[in-house]
Amino acid sequence: MTYVPDNALYNVSKAGVVTLTKTFARDMGKHGIRVNAVGPGSIPTDLNAALYADPQKEIELCNKIPLGRRGTKDDIANCVLFLASEESSYLTGQVIYAEGGWLLV
């Protein structure tokens, strides 16, 4: 997890998701309930469209992502499908960061 400068409320909400995920996973595990979360990277949405309307800004962003591209809604959906499947039956309390390596930079 990283932080966004000058945006304390956003940062606190991200940290809250991580803490709630771990807390609920521990509390609900005894009932056989798994609790995980997805931390999406830069995914084009209506909320951030204006930020990257300039093609040069889009290129600059993609150059900072090790996989060289922004994620898609399908990338996030596939991560959620995995977490909802039996293939992840031994995962709980985890935040899966689907962000193309952004946090490695």
Question: Across the structure, where does each feature detected by a protein language model lie?
Answer:
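Catalytic loop of short-chain dehydrogenase/reductase
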Residues: 1-16, 21-30, 43
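A conserved structural motif in NAD(P)-dependent oxidoreductases
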Residues: 65-76, 87
